[in-house]
Amino acid sequence: MANKYTGTKTEKNLQEAFSGESQARNKYTFFASVAKKEGYEQIAALFLKTADNEKEHAKMWFKELMGIGDTKANLGAAADGENYEWTDMYEGFAKTAEEEGFPELAAKFRMVGEIEKHHEERYRALLKNLETAHVFEKSEVKVWECRNCGHICVGVKAPEVCPVCLLYTSDAADEARSVD
């Protein structure tokens, strides 16, 4: 679905704002880890707080670009993005690195590409489960773990309510998951 900014300089600005805020968020979380490791808890906390602010800014711009859909659409978009990363992006990066004399980096790009391939497969499997109503019910016995308290249940269906912490599956759909 196209957004109202399609083809405009404003759309490019929104994309750049989203990208910049997203990168800043990651950088600040990396910086927080270093500050914490060096014993600067207050500085680490400030980096993390700012990273959370940057996340909200990125979300705001991404929403303007109509980048957030329902779970089905989000799984499809995520799978497509991962496909691009492993089939085109990282392979292209690897070839360039080889041509420029960086074989170790080329190998690393390809290894990350393999991880992205796994990510795509996982998203496509989740999408299939969603489309076939097999998110909380499987055709064979599975181990289910409550994401809230860790209680384990074995069966073909996740419990609607965790018998330990009373979390409702319908209230927090992703709180119960199949372990296998």
What are these regions, as identified by a protein language model?
Residues 9-38, 46-60, 73-99:
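Alpha-helical bundle segments that constitute or directly flank the non-heme di-iron/ferroxidase center
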Residues 89-152:
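A broadly conserved sequence feature marking short terminus-proximal activation segments
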Residues 154-158:
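Short linker/helix segments within small regulatory modules
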Residues 168-173:
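Conserved small/polar residues in nucleotide/adenosyl-binding loops
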